[in-house]
Amino acid sequence: MQRTHIQPHQTMSTILYLTQIQFDFGAIATLPAECERVGIRRPMVVTDAGVKAAGVLQTALDQLAGWPVSIFSDTPPNPTEKAVLAAKAAYIAGECDGLIAVGGGSAIDLAKGLAIVATHEGPLTRYATIEGGSPLITPHAAPLIAVPTTAGTGSEVARGAIIIVEDGRKLGFHSWNLMPKAAICDPELTVGLPSALTAATGMDAIAHCMETFMAPAFNPPADGIALDGLERAWHHIERATRDGQDREARLNMMSASMQGAMAFQKGLGAVHSLSHS
């Protein structure tokens, strides 16, 4: 049998998967156990008005009946430093010790920003990647459990967040210490998504899978994950868009979203860069 020879690459690859993932219809029921596992006793739930209005937030809160829960539901469509600081004030007032993000990429990214400022000194910008701040984000960052309610960004398994800071810049914050300690991926939470949002977030997942696969770094596990995710999204995005109650399509789109972000560590491309410009 002929062997395929590995070609040398100029950059060393990091191959690391950290997040414990609960993935299934009804997985939201594991929320209390995951909180206990990661040491969260007084959680703050970070969400947005749309998730709250759709009743999805209440589904999460029902799992935590009897827990001392604080809620921050003012996440803007694009997370801002102002919103992060408002959430910090509520986090401190509630004597919280961890975070649960229930929503799409915006809520999860805001929670990651909050995980920094709630436990680290100085302004948020100090920890931005472009400012050399990634090494300053320590393991003391507040523990985070991510509960995605859309199938697109994959933020629940990603180590980065994008936040608009006070001077108007859109900055990235990246650290393995920002990885959610758990991701609860319950496709049931996405069945009520409008078709336009299903299509838009689904295309995000497709773009992630394509770009990560084509990135030049050597990371065979990421290649396999990205290709499988692309196949799932390619065959199910139209079905999920046409019929939001199609459970098989919803499950496969949530998987594709997660897989695209799991492969982020291999690298992305121009489309992703332009979307953050």
Listing of model-derived features with the role each one plays in the protein:
Residues 19-23, 47-52, 75-78, 194-197, ...:
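A short N-terminal beta->alpha junction/helix N-cap motif
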Residues 1-72:
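An N-terminal, well-structured beta->alpha segment
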Residues 268-277:
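C-terminal catalytic subdomain
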Residues 82-188:
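Glycine/threonine-rich beta-strand-loop-alpha-helix active-site module
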Residues 159-264:
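Carboxylate- and glycine-rich phosphate/diphosphate-binding segment that chelates Mg2+/Mn2+
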Residues 52-123, 238-250:
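N-terminal small/polar loop signature for handling phosphorylated ligands or for N-terminal nucleophile
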